[in-house]
Amino acid sequence: MVQKYQSPVRVYKHPFELIMAAYERRFPTCPLIPMFVDSDTVSEFKSEDGALHVIERRCKLDIDAPRLLKKIAGVDYVYFVQKNSLNSRDRTLHIEAHNETFSNRVIIHEHCCYTVHPENEDWTCFEQSASLDIKSFFGFESTVEKIAMKHYTSNIKKGKEIIEYYLRQLEEEGITFVPRWTPPPVGPSETCSSSKNQVTSAAVLVPDAAAVMEGLSGENLSSPGTASEPVVGTPDDKLDADYIKRYLGDLTPLQESCLIRLRQWLQETHKGKIPKDEHILRFLRARDFNIDKAREIMCQSLTWRKQHQVDYILDTWTPPQVLLDYYAGGWHHHDKDGRPLYVLRLGQMDTKGLVRALGEEALLRYVLSINEEGLRRCEENTKVFGRPISSWTCLVDLEGLNMRHLWRPGVKALLRIIEVVEANYPETLGRLLILRAPRVFPVLWTLVSPFIDDNTRRKFLIYAGNDYQGPGGLLDYIDKEIIPDFLSGECMCDVPEGGLVPKSLYRTAEELENEDLKLWTETIYQSASVFKGAPHEILIQIVDASSVITWDFDVCKGDIVFNIYHSKRSPQPPKKDSLGAHSITSPGGNNVQLIDKVWQLGRDYSMVESPLICKEGESVQGSHVTRWPGFYILQWKFHTMPACAATNLPRVDDVLASLQVSSHKCKVMYYTEVIGSEDFRGSMTSLESSHSGFSQLSAATTSSSQSQSSSMISR
C-alpha cells in the first residue's frame, strides 16, 4: 500500500532570500542531519540573467537499519537524486527528490516548495509532500516501510530547526539581509513592456493570494457554530502549522498529514463547504488516525446530520417545558483544564416519568441539543483560554439512584442515546466523573458498558460514597470555587432538581408514537436503495417550460450514475401490490423503477443530461432548466466499473469501493424541488451554464441541444 505524507503550511517570518541563504548551507553535508553523509553536484544550470538556477545533486544517506537487513540488501548507503529549481524572479524554490538505490523495488518521491507568504512578502512559506511505495524487498517489506517512515517523520520537523539554526549562524556573521534579485539593465522599450507584464501578472495573482489566506488565517474555521456547520472552502485552502497548534493542538507529523489529506478529500467531494477542522480531527482520533475508517464513519455522520437537520437543532427546536422542569442537568462553568462542565443529577431524575411523558425521541433530541451546545462552548473556551479545547467534562451525581432507574424502556432509551452519541460525537467527552455511586450502580454499568467505546470508557472516574472528597477526588479536576452546592461546595448550581414527573403529564403509547414520528419525519430528505439492475427513479411532471428542477442528494453507500430523462408520455406507476419489476422495499429505503423495459431510448424517452458518475461520500447539488413540458425522470443507477479497467492496475480506493458494494447495493438520500419560471426571480443565465461543476471526480456535465443546466457539489 502506498504511504503518503502531506505537511501543513509552515511559515518562516523571514524574507525568501534570507531563507535561501540559510538553506544553501545544508550542502554538501549537514552535521545536524547525521544520516546525511555527503552530496555531489551532478548538473547545474544558471540563466543569463541569474533569475533561474537549477541544480541536481546525488545525496548519500546512512540509514539506521538492522545490520542483517543491510547485509541481505548488499548496501551500506542509500543514494537519492535531488533536483532544486530556484526562480529568483518569482521567489520560489521547488525541490524534487527520488531514490536511486533499489528504485525497481522501492519508489520514493518527495516534493518541497518554498514560496513567498501571500499576505506578507517578507515571510516565507514551506510545504512538503511525499509518497512511499514498496513493491518488494526480499520479504522484508513491512520492516523497510517501518524504518522508512520512522526516519522520515523524525526528520520532518527537524527541517525548520535546521533553517533556524543557519539563520542564527548568518546573524552571528552579520548577515541579516539578502537583496532581492533584480533584472539586468534593459532598453527603454523593453522596460515598458516588462513593467506592463509585471502589472498584469500581479493583478492576476492577487485574488489567488487572498483565497489562499482565507485558508491560512483559519478565521472561518474557528467561528462559533455547530460541529458540522458548513465552512466555505476551496482546493486552495491550506492549513497553517501555527493555526493547527493554536486551535487543534500538538499533532505528530503523520497526524497532521492525515488531517490534511482527509480535509482535501472532503474539499473534492463536498466542494465549497466542509466540516470544521475540529470535527474532522475528532473522527480521526476516534479511529486512531486511520483515514479510511475515519472517512467512513464521518460520511455516515454527516449524512445523519443532514437527514435530521441536526445542524439547526439549537435554532429551530425548543425543548418541551417538561424537560426544562424535570431534566436534572445543565452547564456549570468549566474544569481546571478549561473544558466546559456539564452536571447531570441522574439519581434525582425520574427517567420513567420522562419517557412516559415525552417519549424516547424527544429525550434523544434534547441530548443532541446538549451535545451541540457543548461543541459551541468548546469553541468559545478555545478562544478564552488561548489553547485548543475540543471536549467537555461531565459530572454525574448518582445519589438517589435505585431500581426505578432500571425500568426496561428507560434503559432501552439510554442505550439508544449512547449509541447515537458514540457514532456522531466521537472524542467529545474529555472526562466523566461519576460521584456517589450506590450499590445498584454495578447493575446499570453491566447493562450500558458494552455499548461504550473502549477509548471513552478509559475516561471514566467512579467514586462511591464520599470518596470524591478525598485525595484524587473532585478537587483534582474542578476548582473549589465552582464545586456545586449539592456536593458540599460553595457555588450555586443552576440545574433543575428533577423530581417525579406528575402522572397527569403521562401520554398514551399512541400519542407518543405519533409524536416520535413527527419529530423524525420533519426531514425533507428521502432515502432510496439502488441495486445492480434495479435503479431508483422518481417522476416530475412539468406543465410550463423554463421551469427549474433542483436536486440535492448524498451518496451514502457505493458509487452511482445520475441521469435525467424526458418523456412526452407518463410511465406506468408501480403497482403497490406488486414488487416484481417495478418496486423493491428494503430497510435502507425504497426502490422504484418507472421506465418500462419495452421503452427505447430516443423513441419513447430522451436523455437531457450527460450521465454523471458520483462516488461514495459525495454530496451533490444541481439544477436543470426545462425546455419543454412533459414528464422528467430522475434516475440513480448502480455504477459498474468498465470492463477495460481490468487490464490496468486498480487503485486502492477502487478496490475498497468494490469490496464495500460487493452486495451490489447502493444507498442515496435525496431531495428535489420544482421552481416555476414565474416564481424564480434570480438570473436565469446563472442556471444556463454550458459547463457543470457537478463533480471534480467525474467529467463535467455539459448542456446538450435539449437542455441547459448548472450543477455543483456542495455540503
UniProtKB/Swiss-Prot annotation:
Q: Which keywords, in A-to-Z order, does the entry hold?
A: Cytoplasm, Golgi apparatus, Immunity, Innate immunity, Phosphoprotein, Signal transduction inhibitor
**Ranges where the GOLD domain occurs:** 521-674
One Pfam family here: CRAL_TRIO_N
Gene Ontology CC terms? cytoplasm; cytosol; Golgi apparatus; nucleoplasm
Q: Where are the transmembrane segments?
A: none
PRELI/MSF1 domain: which residues? Answer: 3-175
At which residues is Phosphoserine found? S586
List every position bearing Phosphothreonine: T234
Mind telling me which Gene3D superfamilies this protein's record contains? CRAL-TRIO lipid binding domain (3.40.525.10), GOLD domain (2.60.120.680)
| One of the GO biological process terms | choline transport
Q: Give a GO molecular function annotation for the protein.
A: RIG-I binding
* Localization, UniProt: Cytoplasm; Golgi apparatus
Q: Return the annotated region ranges for Required for interaction and inhibitory function toward RIGI.
A: 1-510
In its keyword annotation, does this UniProt entry include Cytoplasm?
A: yes
Give the principal location in a single coarse category.
cytoplasm
Q: How does it assemble?
A: Interacts with RIGI (via tandem CARD domain); the interaction is direct. Interacts (via GOLD domain) with SLC18A3; the interaction is direct. Interacts with SLC5A7 (via GOLD domain); the interaction is direct.
What PANTHER family does this protein's entry cite? SEC14 RELATED PROTEIN, SEC14-LIKE PROTEIN 1
What this protein is called in its record is SEC14-like protein 1
Species per Swiss-Prot/TrEMBL record: Mus musculus
Gene that encodes it: Sec14l1
